Amino acid sequence: MVDYPSRKKEWSYDRKLADAKAAGFDAIATAAIPEVGRAAKKHGLTVLGYFSSGKQEEFAGELKANKKIGAHHINVQLADEDTLTPEALGLALILMQEGKSLGLEPAVEMHRDTCTETPEKAYALADAYLKVTGELLPITWDFSHFAIVKHLHPGNYAEKLLVCPDLIQRAQMFHFRPFNGHHCQIPATDGNGKLTPELKDWLPFAEALLKCWLDGNRNTNRELFVCPEMGPVASGYNLSTLPNSWEDAKVVRLEIDKIWKKLTTKRR
């Protein structure tokens, strides 16, 4: 919702979150911005936190700042693309220890320009974390980054990406950014309100991913937070000639909700 509806006439946080609530959203993903925390509380939205850091001395302060605005689950983009696994492991261990001491649940995001920017680096970190702690690494999954790294196509999204069901089922935060093998974000609509062929190609993967998570979380009360993440023009994810990313995010939310209801109805 950055620069929404335009850079010159950007809405206040309160108005943005009121619109999110009206559109059916249950939560807001945000950095530790006090105004967002207050608006989220006003509109009854769960706060999911965020920060990016590769410096262990910053972790406690960042976690506390996120806790202060109401976040319990906190997404962390950890370190840099040239951070090697031994250093990344040390940082992840400290991050989780700091989070536990504060009663928080941080999770390491799979993201470019971090220590998890490729599947190989991400799974090496997860393997090392499991070896040291005996526990699965808490992860925020964003498969759009892995898809472009591996140059995938709709026919092999699930085969190539859903290779660690235990880590997927352990996770509670997912970024459902529609993608293909060339673009980490594709438009959801064609500018006239119709779903794009590219989104339709991606939706079966979204269903396979949700099914995978549900298969490991039957008869539990664990929460799942799915963000239909459509980045704005300001961040470079969206392009100026494509439909507005926030309006597209609303459409993606509806499509994901349809899939969720289909899968959970089958379980009963």
Functional labels for PLM-detected ranges:
Residues 26-27, 45-49, 72-74, 105-106, ...:
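Hydrophobic beta-strand segments of well-ordered beta-sheets in folded domains
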Residues 1, 30-32, 49-54, 76-80, ...:
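A cross-domain feature marking catalytic cores of carbohydrate-active enzymes
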Residues 15-20, 76, 90-92, 106-111, ...:
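A generic short-segment signal for beta-strand/edge and adjacent turn/coil regions
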Residues 46-47, 51-138:
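Active-site acidic/histidine proton-transfer and metal-coordination neighborhood
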Residues 3-14, 70, 126-130, 134-137, ...:
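Histidine-acidic metal/acid-base catalytic patches
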Residues 15-19, 35-38, 42, 61-68, ...:
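Alpha-helical scaffolding segments of alpha/beta enzyme cores, especially the outer helices
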Residues 1-71, 253-268:
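N-terminal pre-domain/capping segments
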Residues 5-10, 25-38, 51-60, 80-87, ...:
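Acidic-and-aromatic substrate-binding clefts and catalytic sites of carbohydrate-active enzymes
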